[in-house]
């Protein structure tokens, strides 16, 4: 049964802190929302606790996404680069929490998959892998989901070029779609304004 009167963010934060204990790296409350960050080694266990603990009961994962912090705060950020953020919902207790975990290795970002905890994580984790290159350990079908299987790189990484590396086009001679190096040339477009005499009835 849905609770009509959810606890306050402060109360929820206290409950989560008590449930997760020393697994909590940080816990913040902003705009009435609770964000808890755990270590990569405790991520899977924390997910199970948040789902099953009496004061939490986050039965649904409603979103999971990757984040690239390499340009955070105009490049002044010096923490770990890749993060996975999950948004959890308790239907029975009418409350939400954001769960974050940072990948411990910037060169080879890996965290545990929570697909076994929430089935909805399946495609979300595939999307984060496709766009950010984050590996989800234990995921049983970690394939690209948005880009082509032959795509080079991960397009949501901050260092990925806006134009990409290759483009696809139909080759009439080969009668098939082919890849070729990007042919877009960057150019600067400066708008030119021509103001006529007595423009708009003004002298």
Curated annotation (Swiss-Prot):
Membrane topology summary: Peripheral membrane protein
Subcellular location: Cell inner membrane
Main location: membrane
Listed EC numbers: 7.1.1.-
SUPFAM superfamilies named among the record's database cross-references: Nqo5-like
tRNA-binding is among the record's keywords: no
UniProt xrefs under Gene3D superfamilies: NADH:ubiquinone oxidoreductase, 30kDa subunit
Entry GO MF terms: NADH dehydrogenase (ubiquinone) activity; NADH:ubiquinone reductase (non-electrogenic) activity; quinone binding
Catalytic activity: a quinone + NADH + 5 H(+)(in) = a quinol + NAD(+) + 4 H(+)(out)
GO cellular component: a single term: plasma membrane
Matches recorded under Pfam families: Complex1_30kDa
Keywords associated with the record: Cell inner membrane, Cell membrane, Membrane, NAD, Quinone, Translocase, Transport, Ubiquinone
InterPro entries the record matches: NADH_DH_suC (IPR010218), NADH_quin_OxRdtase_su_C/D-like (IPR037232), NADH_UbQ_OxRdtase_30kDa_su (IPR001268), NADH_UbQ_OxRdtase_CS (IPR020396)
The protein's assembly and partners: NDH-1 is composed of 14 different subunits. Subunits NuoB, C, D, E, F, and G constitute the peripheral sector of the complex.
Role played: NDH-1 shuttles electrons from NADH, via FMN and iron-sulfur (Fe-S) centers, to quinones in the respiratory chain. The immediate electron acceptor for the enzyme in this species is believed to be ubiquinone. Couples the redox reaction to proton translocation (for every two electrons transferred, four hydrogen ions are translocated across the cytoplasmic membrane), and thus conserves the redox energy in a proton gradient.
Family: Belongs to the complex I 30 kDa subunit family.
PANTHER family documented for this protein: NADH DEHYDROGENASE [UBIQUINONE] IRON-SULFUR PROTEIN 3, MITOCHONDRIAL, NADH DEHYDROGENASE UBIQUINONE IRON-SULFUR PROTEIN 3
Protein's recorded name: NADH-quinone oxidoreductase subunit C
Species per Swiss-Prot/TrEMBL record: Polaromonas sp. (strain JS666 / ATCC BAA-500)
Lineage per the UniProt record: Bacteria, Pseudomonadati, Pseudomonadota, Betaproteobacteria, Burkholderiales
